[in-house]
From Swiss-Prot:
This is ATP synthase subunit a. Belongs to the ATPase A chain family. It comes from Saccharophagus degradans (strain 2-40 / ATCC 43961 / DSM 17024). GO terms for cellular component: plasma membrane; proton-transporting ATP synthase complex. F-type ATPases have 2 components, CF(1) - the catalytic core - and CF(0) - the membrane proton channel. CF(1) has five subunits: alpha(3), beta(3), gamma(1), delta(1), epsilon(1). CF(0) has three main subunits: a(1), b(2) and c(9-12). The alpha and beta chains form an alternating ring which encloses part of the gamma chain. CF(1) is attached to CF(0) by a central stalk formed by the gamma and epsilon chains, while a peripheral stalk is formed by the delta and b chains. GO terms for molecular function: proton-transporting ATP synthase activity, rotational mechanism.
Length: 311
């Protein structure tokens, strides 16, 4: 991975946890090269980060190229798989792929119907898309941690190239998806209840006074607004961090197991057994995390359609 002089356990772990980052470094920035020399930039420069510090110094506008690349690639692959299944369905010839896709669609549709009791034809396809895409991104965690990063280093010719292959171990990806769900939740809530109904939901719940003491509701508005706003914002944050935390922990365990291969033949054998065992268990984790993300998204969509005034 990193050069031989930097290949310590700490360096190995840090290298695997760093994304391939593209961003802008300011004029006058001093870059530390792999050969020990330094280069001062004469102008603002858009470039790939060579170190974790450079990635940090690029700031908020930096892009994690590996996360975006794998996310888009897996989305396109998923679209190709579903398109192939649809074509086979039109020919009337049964196949393993078609049977699997039908099983997946029926299963997700059943789960969504149990949670979402309103009329919106977009929710079931949304649930299917979210589950499938998150599962595909999680599935990348089963690829041995060194294979694709080493391939990236061979292609670039740079032994210091960073390359993470599991998009869901990047909080930018998981929180990005979560806040997209949050935006849809707000949109559907306003669409179903109106802007006034949405504001009323934020200001008149969970505490409200009886009709005889209606004037007390004015005093409760600040309390309700604070509580509901915190609860609302907590939904996407917890949704994104839950997925990130579980996948990050799983990836870290794979990296720690991979370190055993550098200790010796016996520990390498132990590492192989542990890696196989953890991979088998991790299949459950990646599936469960995709399912939880989909279920919570559906729950939030149902909450957006619920009207408290009807109860």
């Amino acid at each position: 991975m990193a050069s031989s002089e930097e290949l310590t356990a700490t360096g190995y772990i840090q290298h695997h946890l760093q994304n391939l980052t593209y961003g802008k470094l300011p004029a006058g920035y001093v870059r530390h090269n792999a050969d020990g020399t330094h280069t001062e930039l004469a102008a603002n420069t858009w470039t790939f980060a060579h170190t974790a510090q450079e990635a940090k110094d690029m700031g908020f506008m930096a892009v994690h190229v590996d996360t975006l690349g794998w996310g888009i690639f897996l989305a396109l692959l998923l679209g190709f798989i579903f398109r192939s299944a649809v074509k086979k369905a039109h020919t009337g010839k049964p196949s393993g792929l078609l049977s699997f896709v039908e099983f997946l669609v029926e299963g997700i549709n059943s789960v969504v119907k149990d949670i979402f009791h309103h009329k919106n034809r977009l929710i079931a396809p949304m649930g299917l898309t979210i589950f499938s895409w998150v599962f595909m991104m999680n599935l990348m965690d089963l690829i041995p941690v060194d294979w694709l990063p080493m391939l990236a280093q061979v292609v670039t010719g740079d032994s210091h190239t960073f390359f993470k292959v599991v998009p869901t171990t990047d909080p930018n990806a998981t929180l990005g998806m979560a806040f997209t769900v949050f935006a849809l939740m707000i949109m559907f809530s306003i669409k179903e209840k109106g802007a006034l109904g949405f504001v009323k939901e934020l200001t008149c719940h969970p505490f409200f006074a009886p009709k005889k003491l209606w004037y007390l509701n004015i005093l409760l508005i600040p309390v309700n607004t604070i509580l509901e706003t915190v609860a609302l914002i907590a939904k996407p944050i917890s949704l994104g961090l839950r997925l990130f935390g579980n996948m990050y922990a799983g990836e870290m365990i794979f990296i720690l197991i991979a370190l055993l291969f550098s200790v010796g033949l016996v520990m390498g054998f132990v590492g192989g057994v542990l890696q196989w065992a953890w991979a088998v268990f991790h299949i459950l984790v990646i599936t469960l995390q995709a399912f939880i993300f989909m279920v919570l998204t559906t729950v939030y969509m149902a909450m957006a359609h619920d009207n408290h005034d009807e109860h």
